[in-house]
Amino acid sequence: MGHVAVLASSNENKLSELRHALDGWTIELLGADDYPPETGATYYENARAKAEFGRARAGDRWALGEDSGVEIDGLDGGPGVLSARWAAGREAERALEELEGVEGDGRRARYVCELVAITPDGTEHRGTGTLGGRIADTMSGAEGFGFDPVFIPDGEDRTVAQLGNDWKRDNSHRARAARALLVSIMQS
């Protein structure tokens, strides 16, 4: 089942991951410069606002909205929905700075992603994905973006940036959200 969709984002990395996860779909970046501000209290609210923004410009295509972040136990679940604005391109470095001296469970973390798809007729589908793990003591690895150089997934001993983009495309919170989105679509 393939659909033609616009992703209400300017993030090429997210586009690449979603093209892989939503195999058979044709997805393009909306590429607008005037996205609505992320003012939602939840990932869903932000993803839905982006999808609605995209829908107004998508014509007869589906509109995809995505919001994601990392929740770190030692930061009381932060930065959470504020992840994109929390460190302005220095996510991994800031996480290490904020967690200096924090050990054990305080370094537990989870990536969270919410995807919302709105069809041309206005039907909404959504999928949520999470990836549990912990924040490393130092940055390692060259692939990925954001928190990937410091995020070690459960069951692994290397960061997402070390595991690489191929691993991430199949196992990330975004890939899991895409699979959940496909289930939602198939069940409707």
Locations of the language-model features?
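Anionic-ligand binding patches
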Residues: 2-6, 12-188
